[in-house]
Amino acid sequence: MKFNPFVTSDRSKNRKRHFNAPSHIRRKIMSSPLSKELRQKYNVRSMPIRKDDEVQVVRGHYKGQQIGKVVQVYRKKYVIYIERVQREKANGTTVHVGIRPSKVVITRLKLDKDRKKILERKAKSRQVGKEKGKYKEETIEKMQE
C-alpha cells in the first residue's frame, strides 16, 4: 500500500529513474550486504561498494568461489568487476565478468576516515531505531506514581 502521495509506484517511472540515475545516486543503489562477522562488528547491514573491498559472490554462476578484491566499480552498467571472476573470450584473452553488487557479500572493507564516519553514523541511527518506542525505567516509575 502506498503511504506517501509524493512518491510514485508507477513501474515505468521507477525504471526511468533507475536507468537515468546520476552517479551519486547510482553509488547508493550499488550497495552490498556485509558478511555476518562485519555486521556484528559494525552493527551495519549494508554499504555502498567500492574498489579494493573484498567480496564473495553468493548468487549466480560464480557463487561460492574464493574471496576476491573489487577491481572496478562500473556505475554506468551497475556492475562490479572482481579479481578472480573472469572468463576466456573466443580469441583467448581473459576478461572480467560483471557482477551485480546485490549478488555479493562484503567480507572486508577498505576503511578510510570518511568510510569510518559513515559506519559510525549508520550504526548510531540503527541504535536509535532499536530504542524507539521503548520506555526507560524512570518514565515507567513516574507513570506508576
Curated annotation (Swiss-Prot):
Segments for region (Disordered): 1-21, 122-145
Domain of life assignment: Eukaryota
Keyword Manganese among UniProt keywords: no
Residue ranges of the TM segments: none
Gene Ontology molecular function: any one: RNA binding
Keyword set includes Cytoplasm: yes
Chief location category: cytoplasm
PTM annotation (Phosphothreonine): residues: 139
Free-text description of this protein's post-translational modifications in UniProt: Ufmylated by UFL1 in response to endoplasmic reticulum stress, promoting reticulophagy of endoplasmic reticulum sheets.
A single GO BP: response to amino acid starvation
Keyword tags: Cytoplasm, Isopeptide bond, Phosphoprotein, Ribonucleoprotein, Ribosomal protein, Ubl conjugation
Sites of the Glycyl lysine isopeptide (Lys-Gly) (interchain with G-Cter in SUMO2) crosslink: 136
Localization, UniProt: Cytoplasm
GO cellular component term of the entry, any: synapse
Recorded family membership: Belongs to the universal ribosomal protein uL24 family.
Assembly notes: Component of the large ribosomal subunit. Interacts with DHX33.
Role summary: Component of the large ribosomal subunit. The ribosome is a large ribonucleoprotein complex responsible for the synthesis of proteins in the cell.
Matches recorded under NCBIfam families: rplX_A_E (TIGR01080)
Protein name, entry field: Large ribosomal subunit protein uL24
Lineage of origin: Eukaryota, Metazoa, Chordata, Craniata, Vertebrata
